[in-house]
Amino acid sequence: MANIGQFKVGTEWKKLDEVTGVTFEADSSYTIQNKEYQALLVCEGAEAPTDRNVGFILQTGEAFGYTAKSGEYLWVRAYQNVAQFNIAEGI
């Protein structure tokens, strides 16, 4: 799949491989591929104890997902339009 490129953490643009270990906050927005996403939730341990799992959603219902373990970018429309954005630490 095509590389999604950079996204914004706070006021800084970062590449996905530069944000390992970033703690996303619920009710905060992040810009991915020039689109604004809202972080719906933050929970740990869905796939591994070091994963950060964040749901992102657009007002249009479009959801975005990134799987850190496989390094693939996925456009998904998940249950209730919530996707998981997983960033594994230490990879």
Describe the residue ranges of each PLM region:
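Noncatalytic modules at the cell exterior or secretory-pathway interfaces
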Residues: S28-Y30, T67-V82
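Edge beta-strands of jelly-roll/beta-sandwich modules across compartments, strongly enriched
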Residues: L40-E44, Q80-G90
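Short, surface-exposed beta-strand/strand-loop-strand elements in extracellular ectodomains
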Residues: Q33-R52
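A short "linker-to-beta-strand initiation" element
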Residues: M1-V9
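Intrinsically disordered, low-complexity Pro/Gly/Ser/Thr-rich segments with frequent PxxP/GP/PP motifs
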Residues: D51-G71
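Surface-exposed ligand/attachment interfaces on beta-rich extracellular proteins
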Residues: K8-D27
